[in-house]
C-alpha cells in the first residue's frame, strides 16, 4: 500500500459515522478519553506490579509466577478498555494521527509490547522464575509499555 492510499484510508476512517459523531459532540471525546485513561491506569498498574516484581523491586516474598498470573487479568481488562476506547478516539482524528510521529511510535511499540508480553515475557517467566534473565525481561517490558504510554500521551500535544 502506497502512502497516498494509506492517507485515503485514514480520511475514510475520519469521515465515518463514528468519527463525525464524536467530532460533532462537545462532550463525547472527553468522556471516551476519560475511560481510555482509566484503561491506561489499569494496564499500567498491572505492568508496574508485574515488571517491578520481575526486577525484584517489590513483592519480593511473592512468587513471580503468582504475581504474573494475578496481574494478567487486569492487564487484559486494561488492554480491552484501551482498545475499545482508543478506536473511537482514533476515528475522530484519524488524519491527525496519520501525520503524528507519536501515533506511529505508539502503534509499533503497542504491537511489539503485546507480542513481547504474551509470546516472550510471560512464557519465559512462568517456565523459569529464578533465571538471571528475569530482571531484564521486566525492565524491557516496562520500557516498552512506558514508550507506548508516553507516545500515546504525546499524540494529544502533536
Q: Each predicted region: which residue ranges?
A:
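Polytopic transmembrane helical bundles with strong interfacial aromatic enrichment
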Residues: 1-158
Amino acid at each position: 500500500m502506497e502512502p497516498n492510499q494509506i492517507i485515503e484510508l485514514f480520511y475514510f476512517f475520519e469521515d465515518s459515522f463514528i468519527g463525525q459523531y464524536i467530532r460533532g459532540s462537545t462532550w463525547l471525546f472527553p468522556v471516551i478519553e476519560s475511560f481510555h485513561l482509566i484503561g491506561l491506569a489499569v494496564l499500567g498498574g498491572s505492568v508496574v506490579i508485574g515488571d517491578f516484581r520481575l526486577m525484584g523491586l517489590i513483592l519480593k516474598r511473592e512468587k513471580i509466577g503468582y504475581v504474573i498470573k494475578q496481574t494478567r487479568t487486569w492487564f487484559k481488562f486494561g488492554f480491552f478498555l484501551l482498545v475499545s476506547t482508543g478506536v473511537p478516539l482514533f476515528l475522530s482524528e484519524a488524519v491527525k494521527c496519520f501525520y503524528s510521529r507519536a501515533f506511529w511510535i505508539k502503534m509499533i511499540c503497542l504491537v511489539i509490547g503485546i507480542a513481547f508480553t504474551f509470546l516472550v515475557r510471560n512464557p519465559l517467566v512462568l517456565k523459569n522464575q529464578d533465571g538471571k534473565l528475569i530482571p531484564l525481561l521486566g525492565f524491557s517490558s516496562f520500557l516498552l509499555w512506558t514508550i507506548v504510554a508516553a507516545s500515546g500521551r504525546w499524540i494529544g500535544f502533536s
